[in-house]
Swiss-Prot record:
Pathway: Amino-acid biosynthesis; L-lysine biosynthesis via DAP pathway; LL-2,6-diaminopimelate from (S)-tetrahydrodipicolinate (succinylase route): step 3/3. Belongs to the peptidase M20A family. DapE subfamily. The active site is at D70, E134. Zn(2+) 1 binds at H68, D101, E163. InterPro entries: ArgE/DapE_CS (IPR001261), Bact_exopeptidase_dim_dom (IPR036264), DapE_proteobac (IPR005941), Peptidase_M20 (IPR002933), Peptidase_M20_dimer (IPR011650), Peptidase_M20A (IPR050072). Disulfide bonds: none annotated. This is Succinyl-diaminopimelate desuccinylase. Its cofactor is Zn(2+); Co(2+). Zn(2+) 2 binds at D101, E135, H352. Its EC number is 3.5.1.18. Catalyzes the hydrolysis of N-succinyl-L,L-diaminopimelic acid (SDAP), forming succinate and LL-2,6-diaminopimelate (DAP), an intermediate involved in the bacterial biosynthesis of lysine and meso-diaminopimelic acid, an essential component of bacterial cell walls. Keywords: Amino-acid biosynthesis, Cobalt, Diaminopimelate biosynthesis, Hydrolase, Lysine biosynthesis, Metal-binding, Zinc. The lineage of its organism: Bacteria, Pseudomonadati, Pseudomonadota, Alphaproteobacteria, Rhodobacterales. It catalyses: N-succinyl-(2S,6S)-2,6-diaminopimelate + H2O = (2S,6S)-2,6-diaminopimelate + succinate.
Amino acid sequence: MTDPVALTADLIRCPSVTPEEGGALSLLEARLSAAGFACTRVDRNGIANLFARWGEKGHARSFGFNGHTDVVPVGARADWRFDPFGAQVEGDWMYGRGAVDMKSAVAAFAAAAMDFVADTPPDGAVILAITGDEEGDAKDGTVALLDWMAAQGEAMDVCLVGEPTCPDEMGEMMKIGRRGSMTFFFEALGVQGHSAYPHRAKNPLPALAKLVDRLAGLELDTGTDHFDPSTLAVTTFDTGNPANNVIPAACRATVNIRFNDAHSSESLTAMVRGIAAEVAAETGIEITDRVSVSGESFITPPGRLSDLVAAAVETETGRVPVLSTSGGTSDARFVQHHCPVVEFGLVGKSMHQVDERVAIAQIPQLKAIYTRILRDYFA
């Protein structure tokens, strides 16, 4: 039997701060290859990715797991109680960067997959698509894996992403979709001048302030069947002006929108640009924008896959998971173009924090859930 706790510790000891591979995928490749998985490194533009398959290529019954081994920076090491790459155990907890997000889940589904195919070889395929580019730009990670799979005729019937999904208690929540995310980068252009002679300048600040105030006051919607209301947040407002007696020539603001399935990035872009044009006309200030879309909203409708995962979670934890679309973006937004996808993982309270830590008992419990999902899927 593969010990997922020991494998978690081994992965934490790999300093895989995005975009560095840090030895994590090489470690997994060696373990999975020894267990009979056909492994392929799908690196792109310096980003490391690993594809592993047990069973027949292109089989109609192919269950996939997706996850990442890259982690966010640790910040100031002096603030940590233990080495962030030491996998130190204290009491019931294992400490380290990536302990929750998400090396424990990668260890759990890798261990579950290896033991499952050894104990009860299924009529089908088990696929692991693991990236080193989820916490970074996410352009050459899961996207690269999916591009490669399509070109090679590799396919998943369904996929489970092992992101931490439970707010407080193991088993309380799974994700069946995610909100979309997009960011507007605005710049208002005026004419610099002395603050004592404002008539000789053209101050862009009031115009941009008017725009972000108008946007911040919008009610985008009241929610949909599976989503909470969309949100809009003003996240930056900058002039880069250190002088208090100079009217700046330009100022910038950033606005982030998390949107549900009542909208698309295209419809929101049109709406926001329309409001910006109105403000520009009212103030006589030119306002430009650049838009970055991290992903559209999506949902895997409740049904076969969510029922499969929920039943396994309830059996192993005694809890019926809530079907949620809350939170930020994940690589499920890419997988959903390939096959139905849901997310289930550990309690995520300490992810990205100093002293990130995982409750050790949850790791074998998660392996048991993933094993049961595989068993029931191939039954």
